[in-house]
Amino acid sequence: GAALEMKFKEKLDNIESLMKSIEPYEIARTEKIRQRLVESLSSIPEVEYDRGRLEQEMIFYIEKLDINEEKQRLTHHLDYFRETIDSEYGQGKKLGFIAQEMGREINTTGSKSNQAEMQNIVVMMKDELEQIKEQVLNVL
């Protein structure tokens, strides 16, 4: 039991550090998106557009790609998983449900990540989570 608990905590820590390693890419991609849109518009000189409207649309687009909520919920699920393994035994199904929720947040992060580096990190997070799910089956 103790070895399994240590394995869970190691994998949870790995997911958490991978999630934090996304942040530099997340900040840079917002600026890249803005630059790409501005360059695209300036490459078509005859197009006139309302600059204020463009800023509104860019904010809307960037908000759709924002992953702060997913990161916040994933952090909560990681903490809840830790609390659950620290509590009484017989929590296998509950751990399975929490792992499912972590998977949803990781998948949504991947869907919103339109940058190869971020998607690579998401794949690594999925790999760590898959190992957790395999170990949860040993607890059931």
Residue ranges and their predicted role:
Residues A2-L140:
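N-terminal intrinsically disordered, cationic/polar leader segments
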